[in-house]
A protein has these predicted regions:
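Conserved loop->alpha-helix
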Residues: 1-173, 180-181, 190-253
């Protein structure tokens, strides 16, 4: 488990092929304290939980499966990444409980300064919409953040046609997304009712970023149309599953 409080900005220095379309990442740890990290320990890279397979002079190496590469963004090439070591039970939870299991991808719609802060607006696919609530928690590229506004929008209104095809595919339901609960093919987080027979839509949510968060994470590099890793709040995940099975189980004494 993690807290969503980024400990350091590291850098993927090298990406090497590793059987069955996986890769090995050579990561420079930057200011991350590696003194207590052992082979087999977990480190979140851009919000994705990875297992340390080797310690190096500058950091560590991890193996990433083809499935993880398909379900995430930011792990297939070199460049800066957010890093966080797995939490201890004695640690303060400065953000919220984060598993490091990416639920799906989002697309940056806006990232702009507002006074001393920055407004970050992200579009999420329908499968994750039901888990996004006002003042709820969301993990973006490994950073624990608070949602300040949620709005469902038609794709035609929300999506810029100039964005890369990968971004437009994610929002149209053609990209990778994990249904956090429910049977295969069931998007438990999807809204129903008013959206059921209407045009394709997505969920826009806004976040206010304080200067410290911008400075200490890779979020400063975000631009419209860029993909980000999203992990929903664990509590929301369990509530959705409980709602799904309500009425299907016999009454408990």
């Amino acid at each position: 488990m993690f807290t969503g409080i980024v400990a350091a900005i590291g850098s993927i220095r090298q990406v090497s092929p590793l059987g069955e379309d996986g890769v090995r990442l050579d990561v420079a740890a930057g200011e991350l304290d590696m003194s207590d990290v052992a082979i087999g320990d977990s480190i979140a890279i851009q919000g994705a939980c990875m297992t340390v397979v080797e310690k190096t002079a500058e950091g560590f190496a991890v193996d990433v499966s083809a499935e993880s590469l398909r379900r995430t963004t930011g792990l297939a090439g070199t460049g800066p990444v957010n890093l966080e070591k797995a939490m201890r039970l004695s640690d303060r939870v400065g953000g919220h409980l984060v598993s490091g299991h990416v639920d799906g991808l989002g697309v940056v719609r806006r990232f702009e300064p507002v006074g001393e802060s920055h407004l970050l607006e992200i579009l999420a696919p329908q499968a994750l919409a039901g888990f996004l609530v006002y003042k709820g928690s969301i993990t973006v590229d490994g950073v624990s953040l608070t949602v300040n506004h949620v709005e469902d929008l038609p794709l035609a209104k929300a999506v810029d046609p100039a964005w890369p095809e990968a971004a437009r595919a994610v929002l149209a339901g053609r990209g990778p997304s994990v249904a956090p609960a429910g049977a295969p093919g069931t998007a438990i987080g999807a809204h129903s009712g008013a959206h059921a027979e209407t045009e394709p839509w997505c969920c826009a949510f806004q976040i206010n970023l304080i200067p410290h968060t911008v400075a200490q994470t890779t979020l400063k590099r975000l631009t419209p149309g860029r993909l980000v890793n999203l992990e929903i709040d664990t509590v929301a995940r369990y509530l959705a599953r409980m709602q799904e099975v309500a009425g299907k189980l016999p009454a408990q004494n």
